[in-house]
């Protein structure tokens, strides 16, 4: 039962944690109403950060509903996502999604992110060759 909890060590806690994901993104999954950004870690720990702004939903109840659903879905998909820092970024239109629909989209997005994270990253090599 304890593997489904959401303690401090599986959360991105400060601005530096979030900034490292934004600066060194290794995988992205865009799912229309939300965006998942991931950065590979040196260890097997998986951490999640949530960004749900007032632009996505003016009411705190709606923002908290979105965060609750994302945390719940993340808890069930932690194992295939090991070794990643992940930022969930809510986009405009997410508040119109029903809970079941959002949960299904999150399930697909976690799977896509796990597949992308397993692939070796060649983007860095391409970016470096373009700069020369």
Curated annotation (Swiss-Prot):
EC number in record: 3.1.26.5
PROSITE patterns in the record: RIBONUCLEASE_P
GO terms, molecular function: 3'-tRNA processing endoribonuclease activity; ribonuclease P activity; tRNA binding
Pfam families, alphabetized: Ribonuclease_P (PF00825)
Protein family according to the UniProt entry: Belongs to the RnpA family.
Task of the protein: RNaseP catalyzes the removal of the 5'-leader sequence from pre-tRNA to produce the mature 5'-terminus. It can also cleave other RNA substrates such as 4.5S RNA. The protein component plays an auxiliary but essential role in vivo by binding to the 5'-leader sequence and broadening the substrate specificity of the ribozyme.
Protein name: Ribonuclease P protein component
Organism this protein belongs to: Marinomonas sp. (strain MWYL1)
């Amino acid at each position: 039962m304890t593997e489904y909890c959401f303690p401090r060590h599986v959360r991105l806690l400060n601005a530096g944690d979030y900034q490292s994901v934004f600066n060194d993104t290794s995988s992205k999954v865009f799912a229309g109403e939300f965006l998942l950004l991931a950065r590979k870690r040196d260890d097997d720990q998986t951490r999640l950060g949530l960004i749900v702004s007032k632009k996505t939903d003016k009411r705190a109840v709606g923002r908290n509903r979105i965060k609750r659903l994302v945390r719940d879905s993340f808890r069930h998909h932690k194992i295939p996502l090991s070794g990643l820092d992940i930022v969930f970024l809510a986009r405009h239109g997410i508040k119109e999604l029903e809970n079941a629909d959002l949960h299904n989209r999150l399930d697909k997005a976690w799977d896509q992110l796990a597949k992308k994270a397993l692939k070796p990253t060649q983007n860095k090599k391409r970016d470096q060759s373009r700069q020369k």
